[in-house]
Amino acid sequence: MSLCSACTSPASHQLLLNCQGQTVAKSHSSADAGVSLVSGRWCAWWPEHCSESMFPSQHPVLSSNLADSSGQGRSPAGAHPALCPFHKSPWFPHFPQILPREWSWCGPERPAGCSLGLKAEAALVGKK
């Protein structure tokens, strides 16, 4: 059985993953799972224990989208330079159930772009 289970929310077109009790989210559009709510980009959040070996490999959709054209971005250690600490987002207070040591990655977007994604998902994640 997979350590991570997924469920979708048609209303907001977001994919939520519960990985070993921690909630992480990846924004996507209804037409393209690789397109985010943030300026056409996508964002992913995951706890440190959701490593590449147990996270993307068990989710084909994320496996194809968690890497940029150079193959980076699959984990905090080898991800895109635009990685930003999750807890520095102004929307972190909306996620008391998520540890500050988590990270968010918004591709070429800057940390400010990450906060936009968090704002969009605050209500949905808070209801789970």
Curated annotation (Swiss-Prot):
Lineage top rank: taxon: Eukaryota
Protein name in UniProt: Putative uncharacterized protein LINC00574
Species per Swiss-Prot/TrEMBL record: Homo sapiens (Human)
Gene name of this polypeptide: LINC00574
